[in-house]
Design a protein with these regions (language model features):
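Short, flexible, surface-exposed loop segments at domain boundaries
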Residues: 2-135, 140-172
Length: 172
């Protein structure tokens, strides 16, 4: 009986922990404001929605070595964020540009979870293979859980490192 009580307690605690986890989502848009005092970045998404995103010491940056200082009004960015409304927190921010984070759109041809790669066929018919990061793998996992895999339309946000295309963000 004592073991049953422990099991019930464990299951309840695990449920609370799972509920407390925030869903991660991707926002692509343009920086309209950077506030260094409140450590926030306002990003106007493609659909016109403005997201006030809190940055922390845990926030990582791609495409800029200056971190928050590298983001200016008018900068095109992609953001991994948690939370909604006034509680949006940036986990990773990518500055989009020819010498930083690049964008590729297409259709998923193949996903290899073991090798952490995805092959995407572009509109011109060429196939590109992307290695993906752990964070991007979570995007992939959420999309596959929602039924998206081979044949899904995808936008890949990537950098080129040592001759490889490294996907940091996926948007399905």
């Amino acid at each position: 009986m004592r073991y049953l009580g422990s099991l019930v307690l464990f299951v309840c605690l695990a449920g609370v922990i799972c509920v407390a986890q925030d869903v991660v989502s991707v926002v692509h848009g343009t920086v309209t404001k950077v506030d260094h005092d409140t450590k926030t970045v306002v990003v106007k998404a493609e659909d016109g929605t403005e997201h006030t995103i809190k940055v922390t010491g845990q926030t990582t940056y791609k495409g800029t070595k200056e971190g928050l200082d590298g983001l200016k009004e008018g900068t095109e960015v992609v953001v991994h964020k948690t939370g909604t409304g006034a509680k949006e927190t940036g986990m990773e921010i990518g500055k989009i540009g020819k010498d930083s984070v690049k964008v590729s759109e297409g259709t998923v041809v193949k996903v290899d979870h073991g090798a952490k790669t995805v092959v995407v066929k572009g509109a011109d018919g060429t196939e590109k293979t992307f290695d993906y990061t752990e964070t991007a793998g979570k995007d992939m996992g959420q999309a596959i859980g929602a039924g998206a895999e081979k044949g899904a339309k995808v936008t890949v946000y990537y950098t080129e490192e040592s001759g490889k295309k490294i996907a940091h963000f996926f948007r399905f």
